A protein has these predicted regions:
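A broadly tuned "polar low-complexity/structure-edge" signature
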Residues: 29, 203-204
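Polyanionic, low-complexity intrinsically disordered segments
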Residues: 34-159, 163-172, 176-188, 192-202, ...
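Extended, amphipathic alpha-helical scaffolds
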Residues: 210-213
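Flexible secondary-structure boundary motifs
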Residues: 1-51, 77
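Short aromatic/hydrophobic-glycine micro-motifs
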Residues: 9, 218-219
Length: 230
């Protein structure tokens, strides 16, 4: 491909499903240029994963459209990060920061599979300074949140074993406790985080990590009181 051969940019084939993207493209061509009718070109280019017959009318439903958007988004993001890392090596900190932001934004819209794949991409990056270590730490937290949302407990357990919060600030200890379903001392850590301005009521009501405690009515009430009293 042009990216791999001319630009030496990896297509991240282990994370991006290029066969799906090819099928998305060819289906679009059919709809726009061939009255949605399946032809030989579509079948030969896509290997016909849906077993359509020549002459059959092709459609796009809501689920298909959303899945296509997610795959295009993932592919675009990872290619962008690869280009950034190869062409602007002096600003790797900024690229890593953007990875963290994108995983957080995907968590907010419940795009958990994209979060996990983007985080797996970040695992290929070796931190070279304290700031990069901090960002990668946050990315790993986002990965753990996505795994917990998907109830992938086996992968979640592996991820949590690689997260060390011994000397971390209260907000990260809170996240680690929540991800481990450990609520002992959680309110005390919230009080510390509030004092340090690491969290406020708006963050608590917005951030995906706190979905897991907001679902617990008693604990949620106690935490709301904690914000009122501190």
């Amino acid at each position: 491909s042009h990216f791999e051969e001319k630009l030496t940019i990896s297509l991240e084939r282990d994370l991006i499903n290029w066969d799906k993207i090819i099928e998305f493209r060819e289906r679009r061509h059919l709809i726009v240029h061939n009255s949605s009718i399946v032809n030989k070109k579509y079948i030969s280019r896509t290997k016909n994963p849906f077993n359509f017959k020549i002459g059959e009318i092709i459609h796009i439903d809501n689920t298909y459209f959303i899945n296509a958007l997610k795959e295009f988004k993932l592919g675009g993001q990872l290619l962008l990060f690869n280009c950034w890392g190869n062409w602007d090596k002096e600003n790797i900190d900024s690229a890593l920061y953007e990875i963290m932001i994108q995983t957080f934004e995907d968590l907010k819209v419940k795009n958990y599979e994209t979060v996990i794949k983007t985080c797996k991409y970040s695992e290929k990056i070796t931190a070279r300074n304290e700031q990069q270590e901090d960002i990668i730490f946050r990315v790993n937290i986002n990965k753990a949140i996505a795994l917990k949302k998907l109830k992938n407990n086996a992968e979640l357990s592996k991820t949590l074993k690689n997260i060390q919060v011994g000397t971390a600030s209260p907000i990260f200890k809170i996240a680690f406790q929540i991800l481990n379903d450990n609520h002992n001392g959680l309110i005390d850590n919230f009080k510390k985080a509030i004092i340090l301005d690491e969290i406020n009521i708006d963050y608590y009501l917005e951030w995906p990590i706190f979905d897991f405690v907001r679902e617990n009515e008693e604990l949620h009430f106690q935490l709301l009181q904690t914000f009122k009293n501190n």
